[in-house]
Amino acid sequence: MTAYFSTPEKIQASAERIAAIIDAKPNGYFYPPAYFGKPGFLNFTPNVEVAQRAALKKNLPGILATFACGTVQREAGIELQKQTSYGNWNGPGFSGFSTGQQDGSGDLIFQLLVAKAMPPGECQPNAAGGLNRNFDATAFKNSSHPEIPPFATITDIPSVWNQQERSLAQWDGSVKMAFWRNIAAQLPIVGDPSKIDLVNTGVVANFLDGLPPAAYPFDVDMASAVRGEALFKDNCAVCHKPHNDTIYQFRDIGTDMNRAAVLNDAAFHLFAAGFQASCHDQDFLYRSPTGEEVRPCRMAGEDVITARTTPAVQGYVAEVLDGVWARAPYLHNGSIPTLYHLLVPASRPEQFLRGAIQYDTAKVGYVLDPAVTGLVADTSPTLTIYDRRKDGHAGTGHDRNLVVDGKLRRLDWSGPQYADALKDLIEYLKTR
C-alpha cells in the first residue's frame, strides 16, 4: 500500500473550484471560432465547446484523483530511473537536471511501466468512502525492467511547429504521423492509455500543421543574410530540408548516440502496445487540413512506430531549421550553446550555463559563461551548469565536413578565412 496525499473530500472541493472557473468564462473562450471553426479543426462550433465543458466538469473528480495518484507513481518511476539510466558514475541529474530537457523517452517508458503495474481501480473511490490505494511503489522500484536503458538519454525538447514539413518525428525518427506524435506527447502525462482524448489529439495535429515559428525578434543585417542564404543552400539544405526521412548514424555525424539507442526490443513492444491501447475507438476519424478523412486507429505496425532497436537503424533526423534561432542550445541533447559554437566546433566549451534568458544576438543562443552563475543564481533558480563529460551529454558531432550527393558540404567554419562567410550564414539562419 502506498500513502497518497489526498482525500475524496479534497478532490471534490478542488473539482468544484475548477468548475466554477470554467463556468465564469464566456462562450467561445476555450475554442475561439476564429481558430477552431476552420475545416482543419473539425469544424468546431459553439455547441462543441458546451459539450466539452460539460464532459470536463463531469469527469473532474476522476481526473484529479488520477493526478493525485500519479504524483506518487511518478515519484516511483523517477526513483527507478535514477538507479538505472542515471545511476552510472558519470550520470547527469534526472532529465539533465536542466530546464528544457527531459529523458529520452519523454518519461514514457516508466509511465507505461507504472500503468502496467497499477492494480485495477487504483485511486478510484471505494465502498468505504475512500480511495483504493494498493500500488506497491517499493516492489515496483525493486523489480527488473529491461525496457529501461542502462544509460542516460538526455534530450532537448524539440520544436513542434510546421509539422507538415516533417516526415518523421522524435529525434530518432521513430514516429511518422502527426497524430501518433501527439499520442507520444500525451502518454507520459496521462499515463493510462485508455484516458487519451482522441478528439483533442486530432485537433492538436491539425493545429501544428502550418503553425509558423516565431520570427527572430532582433535586428538582422539583410545584405549579409542574402549572402548567407547561398551558403545555406550549398552546404546545409541538402540535409535540412522538408520531408527528409534519412536517419543519420554515428559514422555520418559523430553525435552522442545514447538518445538514438533509447529503444530496445522490450521498450519498443511497450511503446507499440501503449500506442495501440491509446487508440481505443477503431472508428474514430478526423479530417486533415486538406479535408481528407483520417482513421488513425486502423493503422498498425510501422505506420504507428518504427522499431529502431538495433544500431543498424538507429540515428537522428536532420530537422528543417525553421525558427532555429529559438532552439538553442543545439543538437538533440542541447550540448552546443549557440549557432556559432555549432559551426566552429573547436570553440565548443566543455561546460556552459543553461537556463539564462539573456540572448546573445552575435552567436545566436543564450548567455553561457559559467563564471556568472554565482552572480545570478539567486534570482534565476533555473540556472544549471551543462557538463559535456556527463553520460549522454557529449557535444561531439556535426563537426566535420561531409560529402553528400557527391559534393563536399562544409559543416566546420573554423579559421579566419571563413570569418565573413560564417557571419553571413549565422545572419541568414536568424531569418529561418
Swiss-Prot record:
MF term (GO), any: cytochrome-c peroxidase activity
Keywords of the record: Electron transport, Heme, Iron, Metal-binding, Plasmid, Transport
Keyword match Cell membrane: no
Top-level taxon of the source organism: Bacteria
Every Cytochrome c domain range: 223-432
Residue numbers binding heme c: 236, 239-240
Keyword Secreted: no
Name of the protein in its database record: Uncharacterized protein y4iM
Organism: Sinorhizobium fredii (strain NBRC 101917 / NGR234)
